[in-house]
Regions:
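Beta-alpha junction/loop-to-helix N-cap segments that form part of ligand/metal-binding clefts
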Residues: 68-130, 224-239, 243, 248
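Short, low-complexity disordered leader/linker segments with a strong preference
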Residues: 1-33, 58-62, 88
Length: 325
């Protein structure tokens, strides 16, 4: 009788332990696993990542989501390594922050949903010829494109005496190439001459900036991650040379520019996070979800640079808060 009771108790305890193990697995498996690939570290991309994380954790609950953030430090091969690791880990969704991260993620998986942000032109990034606003594959997301015709008009508005505009960008970034081509078309149609200066990486930024400052009246820089990570190199040359820089986004403008048509990277990150929630929680299909663009645009300027260059800024521009040196 004693032995029987002991066996029953032992079996009962085993069942409880096994149940606890499976309950633990169940709780762990119920978490949504998201891998974030950020192409490189600079203010705009950092804000987009922050917005995404805030939106996801607020909607799903921090206890119900496991987010792994990896930064590729501007290296496309590292983007690919991170993407492949996320696929091997079996994440539920990949957030790709910027073009290189998106391209690496798309190459790594055709089944795991990918939500991108800080990508200027998805058709260019994904090589989609017939663009309809949706990708038709496992990719959706938000764009950081501010209207390029308005950016071209800003150059003429702030620098009315300029005759030659220099466009600086990294030739390795497809979205920068796209922006540069469109802005060049707009500037040419406005009667301005355009010189194009490209770099392969950050090591060439100083040399192309020096050349541009000797040959143009104003510089335009699109949303370019390579230059965004090294704006000091541009500022140290363009500032003393007295050449104004009009930037495609606020982070670059803070670093070396006079003015920009600004979007909020935090906001496009938030919207990307909301799209991720729609996919994870409601089963939305990324292949049919419209790529979304920022709707709130603000003309912004850096007061100290505008003053130093003698540029009169219209009243509809908002001053960018400058950090004290």
């Amino acid at each position: 009788m004693n032995k029987t009771i002991k066996k029953v108790l032992a079996l009962g305890l085993s069942a409880v332990l096994v149940g606890s193990v499976f309950a633990g697995c169940s709780a762990q498996d119920s978490k949504y696993r998201i891998g974030i690939i950020q192409s490189q570290q600079h203010a705009a991309l950092d804000e987009a990542t922050r917005g995404f994380q805030d939106a996801v954790t607020q909607a799903l609950g921090a206890e119900n989501v496991e987010i792994t953030l990896q930064n590729a430090s501007g290296d496309s091969a590292t983007c690919a390594t991170i993407a492949n690791q996320f696929v091997a880990d079996g994440v539920d969704l990949i957030m790709a922050n910027a073009t290189a991260a998106l391209q690496a993620s798309m190459q790594a998986t055709a089944s795991i949903p990918i939500v991108a942000t800080s990508v200027t032109d998805y058709a260019t990034a994904l090589e989609i010829a017939d663009w309809t606003g949706v990708t038709g594959i496992n990719v959706t997301g938000t764009s950081d494109l501010a209207p390029l015709d308005q950016q071209a008009a800003m150059i003429q508005e702030l620098c009315p005496d300029a005759q030659t505009v220099g466009i600086l960008y990294c030739s390795a970034e497809p979205n920068s190439v796209y922006q540069a081509n469109v802005v060049e078309e707009n500037l040419t149609s406005m009667g301005l001459a355009v010189n194009v200066y490209t770099c392969a990486d950050t090591n060439e930024i100083a040399s192309i900036t020096t050349q541009a400052c000797q040959e143009v009246d104003v510089i335009y820089i699109p949303t370019d991650n390579t230059i965004a990570s090294a704006t000091a190199a541009v500022d140290q040359i363009a500032g003393p040379a007295g050449i104004p820089v009009i930037a495609g986004e606020e982070g670059i403008c803070k670093g070396c520019g006079v003015a920009t048509l600004s979007i909020s990277y935090y906001d496009i990150g938030v919207r990307a996070g909301e799209m991720a929630v729609e996919i994870l929680q409601n089963g939305a299909d990324p292949s049919t979800m419209q790529i979304e663009t920022a709707t709130d645009l603000t003309k912004k300027y850096v007061p100290s640079r505008a003053q130093a260059l003698g540029i009169t800024v219209p009243s509809d521009y908002v001053a960018i808060e400058e950090t004290a040196e």
